[in-house]
Every structure is written in C-alpha cells, then in structure tokens.
C-alpha cells in the first residue's frame, strides 16, 4: 500500500511542478528559471517542515504512509532538490559540516555535469544522419 501512496504523491507533485513552472514562466517571461527556483525552494521548505513536524521529535505523529506520501511522493514528484536539502541539513545538524559541504559540492557539480553530458549526447544523436 505504501507504493500506492508514493505513486499518488508523485503524480500530484509532478503535476504541481508542471503547473507552477509554466505559470511562473508566463509571468516572468521565462528568461530565468524562476519557476524551478521556486519549486526547489518551496519543496525544500515543505520536506524540512513536514519531516521535522512529524518526525521522532516532532509535534505531530502521523503514520509512515503519510510521511511516505508527502516526503517521497509529493516532494519527490515536485522536486528531488528537497531530499538533497533535507539530507544536507541533517548532516549539518549532526555537526558533519565537511560532509554537508561535500554533499553540496558534489551534488551541484555532478548534476551540472550530468545535464551537460546528457545535452551533448542528445545533440550528437540529433545530428546523426538518418535519425
């Protein structure tokens, strides 16, 4: 049943991301990815807020299915940046500043390299004759 809640949350998060990024692009002219920035920041806020509010030391107790729905499903579908942010915050809260910094540096660098590499490969495939 947990998979069902995660799938529903992911679908809702993905649809929300699509709508928000489109709406923000229409409002701002799409010159800068403000929609994505908004998605990443708000998703990070949501996972940090909900995770802390409903965690072991939280004020509210919710079932594991609810946490999976919101934190993995909804936030995961909305943005994967929220998971990265929560993991980095947890490292910092544990005093693991070097690991937190490493997580930040590696995530940003490798994600940028991966998107660049994906772009390069796609351009190469697009330029192949007969494609």
From Swiss-Prot:
Keyword Glycosyltransferase in record: no
GO biological process: cellular detoxification of fluoride
Keyword terms of this UniProt record: Cell inner membrane, Cell membrane, Ion channel, Ion transport, Membrane, Metal-binding, Sodium, Transmembrane, Transmembrane helix, Transport
Localization per record: Cell inner membrane
One GO cellular component, as annotated: plasma membrane
Topological type in the membrane: Multi-pass membrane protein
Reactions it catalyzes: fluoride(in) = fluoride(out)
Single GO MF descriptor: fluoride channel activity
Residues binding Na(+), per UniProt: 76, 79
Transmembrane intervals: 4-24, 30-50, 68-88, 104-124
Pfam families: CRCB
Superkingdom in the source lineage: Bacteria
Family (UniProt): Belongs to the fluoride channel Fluc/FEX (TC 1.A.43) family.
Function: Fluoride-specific ion channel. Important for reducing fluoride concentration in the cell, thus reducing its toxicity.
Name of this chain's protein: Fluoride-specific ion channel FluC
Lineage start: Bacteria, Pseudomonadati, Pseudomonadota, Alphaproteobacteria, Hyphomicrobiales
């Amino acid at each position: 049943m947990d998979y069902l809640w995660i799938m529903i949350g992911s679908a809702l998060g993905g649809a929300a991301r699509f709508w928000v990024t489109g709406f923000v692009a229409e409002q701002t002219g799409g010159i800068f990815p403000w929609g994505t920035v908004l998605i990443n920041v708000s998703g990070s806020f949501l996972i940090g807020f909900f995770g802390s509010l409903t965690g072991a030391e939280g004020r509210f107790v919710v079932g594991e299915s609810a946490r999976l729905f919101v934190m993995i499903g909804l936030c995961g579908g909305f943005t994967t940046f929220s998971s990265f942010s929560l993991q980095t915050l947890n490292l910092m809260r544990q005093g693991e500043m070097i690991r937190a910094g490493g997580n930040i540096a590696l995530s940003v660098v490798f994600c940028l390299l991966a998107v660049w590499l994906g772009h390069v490969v796609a351009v190469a495939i697009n330029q192949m004759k007969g494609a």
